UniProtKB/Swiss-Prot annotation:
The keyword Ribonucleoprotein does not apply. Keywords: Plasmid, Secreted, Virulence. InterPro entries: T3SS_YopR, YopR_core. The keyword Lipid metabolism does not apply. It comes from Yersinia pestis. This is Type 3 secretion system regulator YopR. NCBIfam families: type_III_yopR (TIGR02509). The core domain is composed of five alpha-helices that display structural similarity with one domain of YopN/SctW, a central regulator of type III secretion in Y.pestis. Disruption phenotype: Mutants lacking this gene are defective for virulence in a mouse model of septicemic plague. Belongs to the YopR family.
Length: 165
């Protein structure tokens, strides 16, 4: 329900008995949207703090990575846990990326999360959809690892570009 109000309509609504009944659903909808936004923002901030803690620790703290990987693993198992057969990269990889995009937008983070998820599902290969999910993650990592290393190389070695050739 969308209600557009201006000064004249607010004045006329306030004088009518419909004001409360008209504004009440809109107010509750706005409250719900605000609560959802605050929850998602706090979850994003929490994940960001955890990522900073993970990268600040030397060597990287695998307990923090496990906390970050758990909701992604659950989402991937919910989405791909019952699939059987072979992976169709043109269909399945974009779906995998859309699930990953919900949690993070950085390829380097995807790499760490996918490796952690893959490590967690390897011993339990007896479940129905796990070989499929394992193959799907491997295919994504075959794309993600080289592209991340190229970006990393460009970022760390850009001052050494040979311009003579």
């Amino acid at each position: 329900m969308t209600v557009t109000l201006n000064r004249g309509s607010i004045t006329s609504l306030m004088s009518s008995s419909q004001a409360v009944s008209t504004l009440q659903p809109v107010a509750s909808e706005l409250k719900t949207q605000l609560e959802n936004k605050l929850k998602s923002e706090s979850a994003e901030k929490t994940r960001e703090v955890l990522w900073q803690q993970y990268y600040a620790s030397n060597p990287p703290d695998h307990a923090v990575l496990e906390v970050l990987a758990t909701p992604v693993r659950e989402a991937l198992l919910a989405r791909f846990g019952q699939h059987q057969g072979s992976v169709v990269p043109a269909i399945d990889l974009p779906e995998l990326r859309s699930v990953l995009q919900q949690f993070d937008s950085f390829g380097k983070r995807w790499e760490a999360i996918l490796l952690q998820v893959l490590e967690g599902i390897k011993p339990n290969e007896s479940q129905v959809g796990l070989p499929y999910l394992s193959e799907l993650i491997n295919k994504e990592l075959m794309i993600l690892l080289p592209s991340n290393s190229i970006v990393d190389s460009l970022l760390h070695n850009s001052h050494q570009i040979d311009m003579d050739t």
